[in-house]
Amino acid sequence: MQVNEYFDGNVTSIAFENGEGRATSGVMLVGDYEFGTSEKELMKIVSGKLEAKLPGEPGFRAYPAGSEFRIDANQKFQVRVIEPTAYLCFYS
């Protein structure tokens, strides 16, 4: 396992690998963030609420707990975290 912190500690993730492949589990505190991808990602919102502006979309869309979204490799996307949010991200 590897622990990573981003944005002055406001985003923390733990990277791991299991039978489903590589993944990170993490928490994002309230704030606005921009992320870049190096490979395809499936982001699942476990708890909390955020809004994301994905590549090619005209604006932000709400993603509450239980929802998910996909991002292709080599893309940037923006996130507005409305309340502290836990996520699980799978890479492929």
Swiss-Prot record:
Keyword Glycosyltransferase: yes
GO CC terms in record: cytosol
Keyword annotations of the record: Glycosyltransferase, Transferase
GO molecular function annotations of the record: guanosine phosphorylase activity; purine-nucleoside phosphorylase activity; pyrimidine-nucleoside phosphorylase activity; thymidine phosphorylase activity; uridine phosphorylase activity
Pfam family, one: Ppnp
First-tier enzyme category under EC: transferase
Disulfide cysteine pairs (residue numbers): none
InterPro entries cross-referenced by the UniProt entry: Ppnp, RmlC-like_jellyroll, RmlC_Cupin_sf
Reaction catalysis annotation: a purine D-ribonucleoside + phosphate = a purine nucleobase + alpha-D-ribose 1-phosphate; adenosine + phosphate = alpha-D-ribose 1-phosphate + adenine; cytidine + phosphate = cytosine + alpha-D-ribose 1-phosphate; guanosine + phosphate = alpha-D-ribose 1-phosphate + guanine
Enzyme Commission number, as recorded: 2.4.2.1, 2.4.2.2
HAMAP family given in the database record: Nucleos_phosphorylase_PpnP
Function description: Catalyzes the phosphorolysis of diverse nucleosides, yielding D-ribose 1-phosphate and the respective free bases. Can use uridine, adenosine, guanosine, cytidine, thymidine, inosine and xanthosine as substrates. Also catalyzes the reverse reactions.
Membership in a protein family: Belongs to the nucleoside phosphorylase PpnP family.
Matches recorded under PANTHER family: PYRIMIDINE/PURINE NUCLEOSIDE PHOSPHORYLASE, PYRIMIDINE_PURINE NUCLEOSIDE PHOSPHORYLASE
Protein name listed in UniProt: Pyrimidine/purine nucleoside phosphorylase
Organism: Rhodopirellula baltica (strain DSM 10527 / NCIMB 13988 / SH1)
Gene name, Swiss-Prot/TrEMBL: ppnP
